[in-house]
Amino acid sequence: MTNIRITEVFTQAMPVLEKLEEAGFEAYFVGGCVRDLLLERPIHDVDIATSAYPEEVKETFAKSIDTGILHGTVTVLYGGSSYEITTFRTESGYQDFRRPDKVTFVQNLDEDLKRRDFTINALAMNRQGEIIDLFDGLGDLKRRVIKAVGVAEDRFHEDALRMMRAVRFMSQLSFSLEEKTRQAIINNHELLSKISVERIREEFVKLALGKDSRQAFKDFLATGLSEECPGLAGKKDQLSVLTDLKAGPDDEAVFWSLIAVLINLPADKISPFMRAWKNSNAMNQQVRQIVAAFDLLSRGEESDFDLFEIGQENLEAALKLAGLLGKPLSSQVLLDRYNRLPIKAAGELAIDGQWLIKEGIKPSPELGQLLRKALEGVVSGQVENSQAAIAEFLAI
């Protein structure tokens, strides 16, 4: 055990531990919040583990919510904040390689910590600021390594998503994989196929947006994890570019666009790929637009109206994508051209469909064609953005 200075987020939660202890129970801060305290990383909330059973937690606090009571978790509302409190437990029988078939509540913190994924996440801290470290998590923090608790293969058979969490933590923390843990991922990477795509995607995106994604991507590819991901099997050579980026992506849509370009997805294959990863329709659409913009800009054939249709957000994203791929596209020139456009949105056009109808144009395909012609004329600088000038330009 060692001592650590307790910061504000823990100080605010301290009365919760005190109240549990006053009721005769043990209570500790556990997991990632303790790890991040020691690494001096931002902490947004804390997790609390206790010897109290869920019903005893509910009896101890006036306000609570049964957020995961079957697995021992109760959310209590106290002092204007909410806290997840979980009973010490053991788990067994992971037939789906993700969730335990059986959860057993125990009265011993040691047993609870044994079920956790990595040594750096198996740390606990009591109300006095003492760190309880059964697996040399403190040493692994100093060595900056991701190491499984106990036998790595057992941990990954319990929850195969932990393999993706390992490489995600590499990226976020700038840590390396402990060799036995790495070998266990190589031996068991096929188990990732048992995990829902949504959960894999969440870890994949966090990996990509982490501060040290290059090394994490090296192990993502080398351990075989990429082979179990939608659309990435057999693509190690193309994806190896991810291991050489000077800086990783800082935007999720740009990241997916980068993947689409690296694996040479034709335009009509982007949507199926994005759907296979269970991405939202909005993300799907944005990625298709970014890749299309990147392809157009790469050819150097873009008109002012093309820039107008691309729009500022997708233009900036396409330029980021070009930078990641080592294909600088005169970014400032293109942005300056965009900023000089007379209008940036169709709603800024001096006329609309109702105005054309008042001018005698019947609702018809012709009306849409005239609006398009007016928009192109204004954007390209052929005509001033005024009703009179547009009327003359359209000869109506």
Swiss-Prot record:
CTP binds at G32, R35, R116, D159, R162, R165, R168. Mg(2+) binds at D45, D47. Its EC number is 2.7.7.72. InterPro entries: Bact_CCA-adding_enz_type3_sf (IPR050264), CCA-adding_enz_C (IPR032810), CCA-adding_enz_firmicutes (IPR023068), NT_sf (IPR043519), PolA_pol_head_dom (IPR002646), PolyA_RNA-bd (IPR032828). Keywords: ATP-binding, Magnesium, Metal-binding, Nucleotide-binding, Nucleotidyltransferase, RNA repair, RNA-binding, Transferase, tRNA processing. ATP binds at G32, R35, R116, D159, R162, R165, R168. One of its GO terms (molecular function) is ATP binding. Its cofactor is Mg(2+). It catalyses: a tRNA precursor + 2 CTP + ATP = a tRNA with a 3' CCA end + 3 diphosphate; a tRNA with a 3' CCA end + 2 CTP + ATP = a tRNA with a 3' CCACCA end + 3 diphosphate. GO terms for biological process: RNA repair; tRNA 3'-terminal CCA addition. Belongs to the tRNA nucleotidyltransferase/poly(A) polymerase family. Bacterial CCA-adding enzyme type 3 subfamily. Catalyzes the addition and repair of the essential 3'-terminal CCA sequence in tRNAs without using a nucleic acid template. Adds these three nucleotides in the order of C, C, and A to the tRNA nucleotide-73, using CTP and ATP as substrates and producing inorganic pyrophosphate. tRNA 3'-terminal CCA addition is required both for tRNA processing and repair. Also involved in tRNA surveillance by mediating tandem CCA addition to generate a CCACCA at the 3' terminus of unstable tRNAs. While stable tRNAs receive only 3'-terminal CCA, unstable tRNAs are marked with CCACCA and rapidly degraded. Homodimer. A single active site specifically recognizes both ATP and CTP and is responsible for their addition. This is CCA-adding enzyme.
